[in-house]
């Protein structure tokens, strides 16, 4: 007796063919194509951990991280928390693999093949490469699309060139000089609220500074770039912060095809936030266009709106251009600066001699006068403190690039599609570059500038490297100098006993449990 009739076989044939095609697609995308790429690099002596099918090295990364977490918990309290290398707990697999495979090695997260680089010569070539064939990883537009889209942080080719021409001039130092007064206004609003808190509590008060600094930085971005106050864009900042946290939880799933399309609770939350942020930004831009029709005010939002009307939009719409670039500015412009300010205050609170030195310099140079750009330029010790903070706690965790075509770097033929990552925190704490005190807070290392602090100087990269260096670094540095110099002139502060040193990766490296400080008015 036949198990299946011919009609039943015909009915089963389409799903069988579909399964075969699906398996073939998965096999080609997740194994055959990546394996060919890996083989090209292995043939040139590039080594790395053996990947598994479907998930690459993700299972091994999780195993190493769990072991590191257990070891860290056992050692808690036995080491100086300020001299410990948080890379060992946040990215322990990078440390492990670098010890096994050296300063250039290959690993995999699903379909994404990553060449991890800390070799100074290779970093220099990356920094000097001006070819558009070396761009931002394509996965960023897909996996981080809700947060970054195809804005200036993630786009490539002609679209990125256009975005850079539109946005970068608004953040040149000549424009930033004119923003000092509005930075002072935003900072004084925050500091006055702290002053009231200290007075209400009898001369000393514990303040968790993180959210205050986010509000301050968001206020600066709103006023300087979008012609509004923080209150008008508050909902956008809140939702972008929620989106950042949600996407950080998915960081290890990057490269697993289809994971972002699954209707999981996390993905549904991300989709809803993305939709809400898009609506809010478009509403602000429409209101801005209506209001500015009778005004001559020209700021960054004006430039973005104008740029949306004449760009190379084969890969995105004018509305996408506005939304994605505004999201990039909102996120990068306030989150990274506020995080650096929080780390800076933590380090000054735990190193009183440097707090005193920076305060004396600030009071001596300012002499009660309102801040201006010339005064800020003379604050050498404060600049050194900021530079050292950016070294120990860089706002960006990685320099991420992708070979958009076959190319050669560092004597290696890089196949198209290879991602190239520089783990900035590892490079910034490398004893062979920074000396035996690489993990210690020592602003004096920058006394003779970056070139005097490390050899070679291109290994210092808090704002990235090469042509894709952060366009907003001038704004960030001036903003940090303004808020820190004003704060130092009004308060002395120390770490609260409630402070827990717990760096966390949420797309940026930030204080995981906040920075509570005890303030006393001078």
From Swiss-Prot:
Primary residence: membrane
Binding-site positions, heme:
470
EC number in record: 1.14.-.-
- Does the entry feature the keyword Repeat, yes or no? no
Q: Which GO terms describe its cellular component?
A: membrane
* Keyword Heme attributed: yes
Protein name, UniProt field = Cytochrome P450 714C2
Which organism is this entry from?
Oryza sativa subsp. japonica (Rice)
**Upper lineage ranks?**
Eukaryota, Viridiplantae, Streptophyta, Embryophyta, Tracheophyta
* Primary gene name: CYP714C2
């Amino acid at each position: 007796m036949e198990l299946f009739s011919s009609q039943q076989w015909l009915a089963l044939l389409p799903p069988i063919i579909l399964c075969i095609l699906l398996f073939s697609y998965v096999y080609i995308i997740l194994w055959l194509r990546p394996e060919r790429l890996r083989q090209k690099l292995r043939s040139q002596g590039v080594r790395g951990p053996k990947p598994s099918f479907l998930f690459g090295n993700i299972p091994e990364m999780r195993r190493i991280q769990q072991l590191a977490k257990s070891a860290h918990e056992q050692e808690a309290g036995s080491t100086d928390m300020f001299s410990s290398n948080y890379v060992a707990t946040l990215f322990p697999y990078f440390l492990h693999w670098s010890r096994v495979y050296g300063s250039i090695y290959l690993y995999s997260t699903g379909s994404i093949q990553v060449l991890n680089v800390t070799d100074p010569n290779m970093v220099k070539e990356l920094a000097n490469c001006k070819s558009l064939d070396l761009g931002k990883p394509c996965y960023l537009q897909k996996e981080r699309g809700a947060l970054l889209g195809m804005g200036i942080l993630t786009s490539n080719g002609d679209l990125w060139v256009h975005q850079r021409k539109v946005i970068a001039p608004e953040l040149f130092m000549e424009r930033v000089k004119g923003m000092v007064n509005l930075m002072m206004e935003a900072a004084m609003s925050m500091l006055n609220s702290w002053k009231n808190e200290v007075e209400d509590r009898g001369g000393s008060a514990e303040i968790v500074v993180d959210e205050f600094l986010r509000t301050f930085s968001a206020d600066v971005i709103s006023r300087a770039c979008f012609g509004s106050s923080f209150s008008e864009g508050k909902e956008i900042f809140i939702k972008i912060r929620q989106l950042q946290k949600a996407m950080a939880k998915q960081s290890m799933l990057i490269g697993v095809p289809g994971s972002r399309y699954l209707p999981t609770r996390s993905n549904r939350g991300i989709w809803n936030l993305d939709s809400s942020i898009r609506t809010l930004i478009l509403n602000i831009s429409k209101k801005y266009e209506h209001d500015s029709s009778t005004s001559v005010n020209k700021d960054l939002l004006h430039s973005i709106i104008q740029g949306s009307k004449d760009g190379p939009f084969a890969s995105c719409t004018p509305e996408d251009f506005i939304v994605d670039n505004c999201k990039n500015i909102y996120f990068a412009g306030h989150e990274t600066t506020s995080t650096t300010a929080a780390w800076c205050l933590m380090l000054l609170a735990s190193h009183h001699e440097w707090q005193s030195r920076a305060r004396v310099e600030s009071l001596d140079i300012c002499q009660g006068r309102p801040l201006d750009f010339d005064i800020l330029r003379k604050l050498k010790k404060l600049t050194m403190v900021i530079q050292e903070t950016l070294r120990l706690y860089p706002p960006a965790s990685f320099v991420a690039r992708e070979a958009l075509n076959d190319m050669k770097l560092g004597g290696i033929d890089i196949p198209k599609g290879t991602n190239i990552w520089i783990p900035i925190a590892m490079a910034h704490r490398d004893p062979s570059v920074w000396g035996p005190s690489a993990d210690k807070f020592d602003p004096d290392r920058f006394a003779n500038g970056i070139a005097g602090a490390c050899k070679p100087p291109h290994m210092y990269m808090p704002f990235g490297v090469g042509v894709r260096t952060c366009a907003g670094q001038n704004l960030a540095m001036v903003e940090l100098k303004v808020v820190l110099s004003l704060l130092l002139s009004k308060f002395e502060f120390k770490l609260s006993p409630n402070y827990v040193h717990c760096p966390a990766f949420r797309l940026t490296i930030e204080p995981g449990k906040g920075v509570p400080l005890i303030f006393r008015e001078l």
